[in-house]
Amino acid sequence: MDDWDTMIDTNVKGLLYVSKAVIPFMTKRNKGHIINLGSVAGKDVYEKGNAYCASKFAVDAISKSMRIDLLQHHIKVTAIHPGAADTEFSLVRFKGNKDDAAKIYDGYKPLYAEDVAEVIYYCSSLPQHVCINDLVLTCTAQANAFYTFKG
């Protein structure tokens, strides 16, 4: 249960609170760009992913709603949904067990934080009149939240 609370506090409430803090400055300037990090788990659900998937589906819904609400203020909203990425997320998921975390990526090359950062940079460097609304990013071995080729 504590993990669920932390997950929802971080992925949903954190997104809402930070957005609430920065949006007034963007609306005052009549421009800005919000980039939210979702997950492929926010696009497709999978076994034993109920709380995590729900929190990432919320990121997707919040991003879509924000995009509509902020159109009149010329504020772009981009949601980036990475797939399997070799980050500290796996360590958290496996309670700090490095061996179990590393096994997740056996047989294929996952995304790395730098890959996601490059995509964020690209999205943020587009002209003001261009917005990537929704982007699903996976390694070439991954089709979606369900299918990853390990071989």
Spans of model-derived segments:
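A short helix-coil junction within the Rossmann-fold of NAD(P)-dependent oxidoreductases
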Residues: 21-30
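Residue(s) in the substrate-gating loop at a strand-loop-helix junction
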Residues: 39
